Amino acid sequence: MMHRLNLNGYEPDRHHEAAVAFCIHAGTDELTSPVHQHRKGQLILALHGAITCTVENALWMVPPQYAVWIPGGVEHSNQVTANAELCFLFIEPSAVTMPTTCCTLKISPLCRELILTLANRTTTQRAEPMTRRLIQVLFDELPQQPQQQLHLPVSSHPKIRTMVEMMAKGPVEWGALGQWAGFFAMSERNLARLIVKETGLSFRQWRQQLQLIMALQGLVKGDTVQKVAHTLGYDSTTAFITMFKKGLGQTPGRYIARLTTVSPQSAKPDPRQ
């Protein structure tokens, strides 16, 4: 079952603090939010579980210890896994220099703890000089967080959208460019050119990036490496591990083990306090 993601009545754009943060827990069901935008820039940090953000030209996957940065004014929607714990950080547009486009950031332990500490501050505490100093340290650290390629380029082109939706639902059935060319009644060459034009990647690269995102979604939920490999249509677990390591630099087991080495601080304050 899927429920709507909400911010407990909190409306970040009505506040003019340089930065404000709070955390939420998804509960036992997946959560989703419709397309929306904020005046403020938004950083979504995954503590447990994962979140997938959809913007006009890409899908952004956010596993634990990572965050997605969404500049102010960018329309987006979110899908959160069951039992996920997330921290939202809203930043005034002129408060700190951040990327002008969406990106996934690998968040350092220091930066993570600064965000969680800010999330635990009450309304009264947020007005104190100590909080302003904390925010300044956070602003010194945030621009230095390395960007990661945990996104799938897409576009508004109906063929590209159809391919994403159908490959996500049936990755085993839709693995070859020739299948898609037949489905769209066009030549493989023309379809390959369209994919490069719309995404900047070849079909093989684009499909592999989708597989990486789907693999992370499955692994974060607790699926075994063998199950994920089978779901994605790999004949052997070894072949899947090779693809995963090539894309993310580590085997699936080591990657997930690293994501779970840090236990998140319990931080679920009511942002209206």
Swiss-Prot record:
CDD domains: cupin_NimR-like_N. Negatively regulates expression of the nimT operon and its own expression. Acts by binding to the nimR-nimT intergenic region. Residues 158-258 form the HTH araC/xylS-type domain. Keywords: DNA-binding, Repressor, Transcription, Transcription regulation. Residues 178-199, 225-248 bind DNA. It comes from Escherichia coli (strain K12). This is HTH-type transcriptional regulator NimR. InterPro entries: AraC-bd (IPR003313), Homeodomain-like_sf (IPR009057), HTH_AraC (IPR018060), HTH_AraC-typ_CS (IPR018062), RmlC-like_jellyroll (IPR014710), RmlC_Cupin_sf (IPR011051). GO terms for biological process: negative regulation of DNA-templated transcription; regulation of DNA-templated transcription. Induction: Negatively autoregulated. GO terms for molecular function: DNA binding; DNA-binding transcription factor activity; sequence-specific DNA binding.
